[in-house]
Each structure stands twice: as C-alpha cells, then as structure tokens.
Amino acid sequence: MGTQRIVFIGAAGEMCRLAIERFAVADGDWELALYDIRPELLEQLVRRLPPGRASAARLDLYDREGLRAAIEGAALVVLGAGPYIRTAGPVMAACLEAGVPYLDFDDDIESTLHALSLHEDAVAAGVPMYIGCGASPGFTNVLVADAAAELDRVDNIDVYWVVGDERGSIGRAVLDHMLRVAAGPCMTWENGGPVLHQSWVETRWTELGAGLGLTMVHETAHPEPVTLPRKYPDAKNIRCFGGLDPAPYNGIVRGVGLAVQKGTMPMVKAIDFLEALMTNKFGNVQGWRNALSGLRNLVRTGEATRTELIKFVALAAVGHTFPHKTGLKVEVTGLRNGLPTTVSRRTPVSGPGTYLFTDMAAATGTACAAFMVVALDEQPGTRAGVFTPEEWAEPERFYKGLERVGTPRDEIFDVSH
C-alpha cells in the first residue's frame, strides 16, 4: 500500500497532541502532517516523534483553498480543533469534496447531529466519516456494544463519566463544552423515544472504578443518547450522566453555566473565569458570584457539606492540585435467557502512573489513536457514510488497537457488579 499520509488539523491542542504521540507508538508506515493555526507550538512534538516521521505547517481551517490543499490525497484526516460546533462543518465538507476519510473526537450534540445528516452525502461520495472517536463519546460507545452483546434484549443503557482535577491542561474549547454540558437543553432517550431534559438537573449515585467509589453524577447533554438509538432502537431508556471530581467543581461549573444559559454572563467571560481558575488565578468578580451560587447549591442538594466546601476553597486558593480520579462506566440492562440481567463495564485505574487515564487528554487522545489504527487497518472502500463507534469499531479490535498504541491490557476495563 505504501506510505499513508495522515493529516491532523488542530494538532497543537492538548488532546490532539496526545493522539499523535500515542498513534506514533503503533509504528506503521505513516507520514504525519500536522497542521495548526500556531505551528510554532508543534516544534517540540515534531522533535519527540521519530526523525522524518512528521512535519508541521500553518493552516486556518476556515481557509477553504488552504484546507483543500492540506488534505489532498490523505489516507485519513483527523480533526482535533474545537469547539466542533464551529470547526467540524468546514472540515467535513472539504473531506467530502476531496473524497478522503475523516475522523474526529466530537463531543457536542449539535455538531454530531449535523454530521449524521451528511450520511447520504458520504455514501454518495464513497467516503467513511468516523465521528465521536474519543473517550466519551467513543470508548464509552464501544463498552456499550461489548456489554450489550451479552444480552438477548437491550432495555436500558446508562453511560457514566467523571473527570478529575485537570488544572493547567484544559483548553478553552474544553471549557466551552463543559459550560454547555452543565446547563441548558439535554437531548436524551426515554420511554422508547427522544425527549428534551434540562442538563445537570437529574442526579443519581453510581459505583465507579479508578478510586472514585460511590459518586453522585448529573444527567448531561452528550452525544451517546443521540447516537446509540441508531443501533439499539428498541431500548426503552438511554441516558448519560457525568460529573467532576472533587465534587465542588460541579458547583462552580453549574453556577457559571446557568449564568451563561440565562444570558447574565457572556460565554467568553465565563470561559475567561474558568480558565483563570484552572491556572490558579483569581478570575473575575462576576464569575465568582455565579460560582459561589453553584457551590451553595451543592450543600442544599447534599452533594457536599459546608466543611468540604471550605476545605476545597482553602486548598484551591493556595494552588493545591487534588489527586486525579477519572473514570468511565456503562451499564446495560435487559434479558438473557429470559431472565433480567445487568452487564457493566468500567475503567479500573487513573491518575499518575497510569497510561490510559493519566488525565482526560490522555484518555481522549489514546482512544482516538486506537480508533485511527482500527480505521486504517480496513481496506479502502470497505465502508462509506457517517458512523459512530458502536456501528463500526468491533470491541475486541478496538481493545487491541488500544494495546497497539501502548495501553496495558489491565487498564482498559473491568466488569463491575
């Protein structure tokens, strides 16, 4: 087949950088073309990769001619620039026009729905487009497919994610996404059909791995309840719940997110505030007013005590970074041999000393790299259309892909009860 040219757009972003580094571990016959609006940020990454393997160049993805020239002849185009609600459209359109395969780790509902609307166009163009190929969505979708395969009938699917203390490594696109997840409309699947809830309102407790234990999580606006019904149309309920660790972060993000939703705080100013907090700066007064409102609500709902909040604020004020605990879990219920059965999968470890879940950038980047390996292993022309992970990435092939990009097998998942 010869050397395959792999194009990364938005390559300087933290998650995309991790995807590139982990993908290089698989050691195929690939030429890595790294593009970003600020290519100088890629110099160290290029030096860390095998000599001659990668090149870096400037690209404004909204420059149609420049984008077309960058992706011409690529075996795969990976979009790592967010927020996807603004970036996915032009890149997907360019890939369709050029006839080259596309892959992203989109976690926004609106851009996911737009991508799915392009399915017939992708079929007509003979182009595979793989969306939502990160940790959540992505890894979670594969875990669902794996668990559901043990059942004769799928009735309910619950997806859970919790992200630990990520200070110092969160970009503005991630903060934008987090604010949209924490407040606003939430598309989900209930009683056999799509419904609209309010994000973060409904809560539940679940037992998570990676040192998290029994954790309160909140219903969130995420792509899984939008895409999984395509594979499991007869399921009664498909829900996604998420949260942050330690719990006070939930109050901060929820309080600021509500202010954005109500129009009392501009999104840019809200992101500025959270970005300041994530880099151990004070932020703005308006942000703190809304954040404190969210923190007080945690006490009212029982998610945290006043003592816990005081301790959290005191430690955070002096720049203390809390032990990183990040985890994913899926729980699928239905019938097996005529009997009600629950099948679960969850990630077992996270934090320093781990590979897959060192932090969320590592989890998303490593999962993306594994999906890339699986996609590139397929013969050209195998499929065409827009696909979410549960539709094309067979679980065992994906797990082997994770191993090929360096993940120890015992970090991938365990079976929870």
Show the residue positions of the predicted features:
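Conserved glycine-rich Rossmann-like NAD(P)H-binding loop of the short-chain dehydrogenase/reductase
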Residues: G28-L41
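Helix N-cap at the beta1-alpha1 junction of Rossmann-like dinucleotide-binding domains, i.e.
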Residues: G13, R38-L41, I109
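Conserved Rossmann-fold cofactor-binding substructure of NAD(P)-dependent oxidoreductases
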Residues: R58-G73, G80-P83
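Rossmann-fold NAD(P)-binding glycine/threonine-rich loop
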Residues: D106-V127
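N-terminal Rossmann NAD(P)H-binding glycine-rich loop of SDR-like oxidoreductase domains
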Residues: F8-R22
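Short, conserved SAM-binding/catalytic segment
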Residues: L45-R53
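C-terminal catalytic/substrate-binding lobe primarily of soluble NAD(P)-dependent oxidoreductases
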Residues: T3, A149-H417
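ADP-ribose/adenylate-binding Rossmann-like module
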Residues: P83, A94-T112
